[in-house]
A protein has these predicted regions:
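Basic, polyanion-binding surface patches
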Residues: 1-190
Length: 190
C-alpha cells in the first residue's frame, strides 16, 4: 500500500544543473536548476524551469540563449551557493572561482569547470505557474576529454554528475550500473 503524499514536487533522479546566461548588459550569471531534463530527441532539446523573479529568467528571455552545465559531484558546494544567492547582487563566478567562457555557438556563457555543457538557443517558452519552462534546442554539447571512455563515448561515471534529492533536500551522486538498456527486458520473452 502506498501513502498518499498529495501533489508534491518529487521525482527521482533530479539533476543539479548550472544554467548560465548573459544579462542585458552582458554580465555572465549562473543559477542552480533541479527541474530540467532532455525533452526531445529530434531536434535535440532540453527543458529547464525557472521562476520569473530569478535573474537568469530575465537573461534567458533577453538573450534567447542559455547553457546547461552539468557539474560533477565534487562541485556540490559551488552549485549550492549558485542557488542560494541572486545574480542581481552577486557575481557568482567571482565568488566561487568558476570561469565563465563565451560560447562560440550561442549568445551565452558556460562554466569551464563543468565536465559537460549543453549550448542552447531558446526554442520555446511555457508559462506553467510558479515557473517558466524554457526549452532549449541543443546546438552543441561539449565534454571534457577525460570524461570519455576508451571508445570515445561519454562516460557518466567519469562525469560523476551531481544529483539533487528533493525529498531530503540534499545532493548525491550516481550509483552502480544495473545492466544494458534494451537488453535486460529480453528475459520477458523478446
Amino acid at each position: 500500500m502506498k501513502k498518499a503524499l498529495g501533489p508534491v514536487i518529487l521525482a527521482y533522479p533530479m539533476p543539479a544543473f548550472l544554467v548560465a546566461a548573459y544579462d542585458e548588459e552582458g554580465k555572465a550569471n549562473i543559477m542552480t536548476a533541479a527541474w530540467g531534463g532532455i525533452c526531445c530527441s529530434n531536434p535535440p532539446c532540453i527543458a529547464v524551469s525557472v521562476r520569473p523573479e530569478r535573474w537568469t529568467h530575465k537573461a534567458i528571455v533577453a538573450r534567447k540563449a542559455f547553457t546547461v552545465c552539468v557539474p560533477s559531484a565534487a562541485q556540490a558546494a559551488m552549485v549550492d551557493f549558485a542557488g542560494m544567492v541572486s545574480g542581481a547582487g552577486e557575481d557568482k563566478f567571482s565568488a566561487t572561482g568558476l570561469t565563465a567562457v563565451r560560447s562560440k555557438v550561442v549568445d551565452a556563457p558556460y562554466v569551464d569547470e563543468c565536465p559537460l555543457v549543453l549550448e542552447c538557443k531558446l526554442q520555446a517558452t511555457l508559462e506553467l505557474g510558479s515557473h517558466t519552462q524554457f526549452v532549449g534546442r541543443i546546438l552543441n554539447v561539449g565534454i571534457e576529454t577525460g570524461c570519455l571512455n576508451e571508445s570515445g563515448q561519454p562516460d557518466m561515471y567519469r562525469i560523476d554528475p551531481l544529483l539533487y534529492d528533493g525529498g531530503q533536500k540534499q545532493y548525491c551522486r550516481v550509483g552502480e550500473p544495473l545492466g544494458k538498456a534494451f537488453s535486460l527486458g529480453r528475459r520477458y520473452g523478446l
